[in-house]
Amino acid sequence: HLLIPWWNAYSFLVTYANVDGWTPPAAGARVPVSPNLLDRWILSTLDRVTGEVVAAMDAYDLQQAVRPLVQFIDDLTNWYIRRSRRRFWKSEDDADKTRAYETLHAVLLRLCQIAAPFVPFISEEIYRNLRTAGLPESVHLSDYPLPGGLARDEALEAQMAKVQEVVGLARQ
């Protein structure tokens, strides 16, 4: 339930990035603020999840630390990527497509760092394949991320939760 969708998200990025010849930005480059609501939502959600995982780990509650990761991977694969696919599939390279690649790349790298204590091998494999020059060679040598590094938008998160709820009710 957790690892295969995460691997598929990684595979999706790598497949389309290779087809388009996209290369990730240099290490340390901040993800530009995107006008796309889905980009802003997934980055905000990732920042919230980072905080939840850190708080649970600080309380030595590892079971509680994993729960937000499971939900986040579901949001990433079943909401963000599914609703962003057409942005990756466009034949022309434009700013929107580039931002989609940059966002997904940044999200997957951060996810590797957050999840590394719980699933070290897949985190390492994905990280090593996505890292750029200037980043530590191993996810386990990188600093553990803290919340606040990404732009939070709690109002957008609340709006998206309502949309997800409506879509979920319509599917039933």
Predicted regions located by residue number:
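Short helix-adjacent coil turns
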Residues: 57-64
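Acidic, turn-prone loop/beta-hairpin segments
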Residues: 19-51, 82-171
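Short, well-ordered beta-strand elements within core beta-sheets of diverse protein domains
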Residues: 53-55
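Core structural elements
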Residues: 1-14, 36-49, 65-87
